[in-house]
């Protein structure tokens, strides 16, 4: 019985300790707007291999420049944009980023609403870096979101969250239409 208890305690510590190394941060805007934008740019800027993005509205030039620089360094970037918010938006980064080497862009609408001629939207604000970090929250990637809005941004390297985000991204990517 004593050996069983020792094994039980050791297993409990090991299972509990698996998540201890995870780095997570949450930012509330507008109070932490600069820290939030820096966290997003730094996370994207740390990419060595891949960046996967699903974004409703993306007009922020600072963030676009970070992606441009990573693509120039060979990072493969896939961006899913919401169709309605970006297709005819002259401020969207889709045309600029879609023209760059190592960046592929596509458009996604939400699901069709029953028998009606209406589609939902792709309302994600998600980035996955190297399959190791995930960033998500309420903020569109716009200047306004990071300067004036009440938004939230969450950054994590927790493996279970990253894997779940990658799976969701993969499902959206399969339905995405070329720009």
Where are these regions (language model features)?
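Sec-dependent signal peptide recognition
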Residues: 2-10
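Acidic-and-aromatic substrate-binding clefts and catalytic sites of carbohydrate-active enzymes
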Residues: 55-62, 85-89
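Hydrophobic h-region of N-terminal signal peptides that target proteins for export
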Residues: 11-21
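Short catalytic-loop micro-motif centered on adjacent basic/acidic residues
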Residues: 50-55, 79-81
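HKD-type phospholipase D/PLD-like phosphodiesterase module
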Residues: 19-45, 69-179
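Helical hinge/lid and interdomain linker segments adjacent to catalytic or ligand-binding clefts
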Residues: 44-49, 57-60, 64-65, 69
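Generic anion/oxyanion-binding catalytic loop in active/binding sites
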Residues: 11, 52, 151
């Amino acid at each position: 019985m004593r050996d069983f208890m020792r094994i039980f305690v050791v297993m409990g510590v090991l299972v509990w300790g698996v998540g201890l190394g995870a780095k997570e941060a949450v930012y509330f805007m507008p109070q932490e707007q600069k820290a939030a934008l820096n966290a997003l740019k730094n996370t994207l800027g740390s990419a060595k291999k891949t960046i996967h993005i699903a974004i409703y509205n993306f007009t922020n030039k600072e963030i676009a420049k970070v992606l441009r620089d990573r693509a120039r360094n060979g990072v493969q970037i896939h961006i899913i944009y919401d169709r309605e918010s970006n297709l005819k938006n002259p401020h969207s980064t889709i045309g600029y980023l879609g023209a760059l080497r190592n960046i592929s862009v596509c458009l996604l609408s939400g699901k069709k609403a029953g028998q009606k001629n209406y589609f939902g939207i792709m309302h994600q604000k998600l980035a996955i870096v190297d399959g190791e970090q995930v960033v998500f929250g309420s903020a569109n990637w716009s200047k306004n979101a990071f300067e004036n809005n009440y938004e939230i941004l969450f950054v994590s390297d927790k493996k279970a969250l990253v894997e779940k985000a990658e799976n969701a991204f993969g499902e959206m990517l399969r339905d995405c239409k070329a720009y």
